[in-house]
Amino acid sequence: GLTREIPVKMLGDTRILYVTNCPAFESVAQFEESLIALLVKINEKDHYTYKHSGSVLKYALCLYDAMESQMEHVSRNDMAVAALFHDVGKCFIPVEILQKPEALEPSETRYIFRHPIDSGRMLRAEFGDAVAETAMNHHERLDGSGYPKGLMAEDIGLPARIIAVADAFDAMTTYRGYNKVKSFEEAAEELVGLCDLFDCQVAETLLQLVNNGTIKKEEKEETEPDEQTR
């Protein structure tokens, strides 16, 4: 069976968490010059996004494990790939837009709205439609207010809902240069209260995992704040 432990692999001086014995991740290793290399480029452009990818992977797999009975049509490998590479499309966003502290101009927001599409496009060729759609839909919201397609609840699969919660949770609990950092408990409770946007069951599961210590802040965190990013 697949290990439940998520070991740490060093890529340069940045930690990327991944499941070493999953076939999907052995496949990723074979394409180090493409997807892994793009993550390295993202690290050079925007360190927050790189670290964020590893955190979203960790949280998404914890949620997957807790909700495994509902994930019969979704493999843990596919969830892991979609979570790790959900933001890989950001490699096409100019750094001045990623790190801009003030409101973006309409001509600039198109880059932000585009990145899930680029992530899906880059993943589809190597990992198939299911992984691509999951990554592409992580900014969709249940009430149709998300992007890039403005999908409604019935059109957003559970894997994408899980990554959406994991993505928002990490953004709320990590300093990005312009935000107030929330505690893990505060962030999880707030997400439970946003059930018009995020899946209630996923958010409630996250809160349970925070309360029981399955998801907790690492003892050794970097103390220097990251540059602001989208």
Task: State the predicted function of each range.
Residues Y18-K41:
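Sensory coupling linkers of modular signal transduction proteins
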Residues L2-E26:
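Ligand-binding loop in jelly-roll beta-barrel domains
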Residues I36-R230:
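Histidine- and acidic-residue-rich, metal-dependent catalytic cores
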